[in-house]
Amino acid sequence: MTIETEAADDEPKKIEINNILVPIDGSEYSLKAAQYATRVARNEKAQLFCIHIVTPRMPYGYATPAASFTESRYYEDIKHKVELWFDNVRNMAKDEGIPDIKTEIFIDVKSVIESILDYASHKNIDLIVIGTRGRTGLKRFFMGSVANGVLQHAHCPVLVVR
C-alpha cells in the first residue's frame, strides 16, 4: 500500500507506514477495520496497535441500589469484554502472519476522539484504521461521530472501513 502526499515542490512523496492504530469497540465495523488493519500491517511489515477507550461513567443498570456491582466490578466487566475483542484481533493478526500486536485499554476523561488522537500522536502512528460506526444505536448518521472526528483532526492518514 502506497500513500502519497503532495510535497512542497508538487512531487509525490511516499509515506512510510511503520505503526498502525485500530480503535476497537466490539462493533461489527471496528472488527472489519481490524481485518483491514492486519492486512495492511502484514503488507507494510508494520506494528499494529489496538486500543479501546473507556469513559469513566457507570451505566444506569450498575448504579441501582440493589445492584451488587461496584465501580471496580464495572471496569472488570469491561476489561473482560475488551480482552475478548483483543483476542479476536490477535487471532486475525496471527492468521496474517503477525506474531504480536500491542493492545491497551484506557480509562480517559477526555472524549474518545481526543483519546484516540492523543494516543496516535504519542505512539507516532502513521495510519489509523477505523470503522464507520461504533456501537451506538444512532444509525441516522452516515458516518459515526468518532470516525468523523478522527478523520477531521488526525495528524496522519485515516482509513475508514464500512
Name the predicted role of every residue range:
Residues 1-8, 119-162:
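Gly/Ser-rich helix-loop-strand patches that form or flank binding pockets
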Residues 1-15, 91-128:
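Structural beta-alpha unit
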Residues 11-70, 94-96:
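Small/aliphatic-rich secondary-structure junction motif
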Residues 37, 89, 116, 150:
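Aromatic/hydrophobic pocket-lining residues that form π-stacking "cages" and hydrophobic walls in ligand
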Residues 46-47, 99, 125, 156:
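Short glycine/serine/threonine/alanine-rich loop segments
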Residues 51, 102-106, 159:
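General small-molecule cofactor/ligand-binding pocket signal
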Residues 69-84:
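A short acidic, glycine-rich active-site loop
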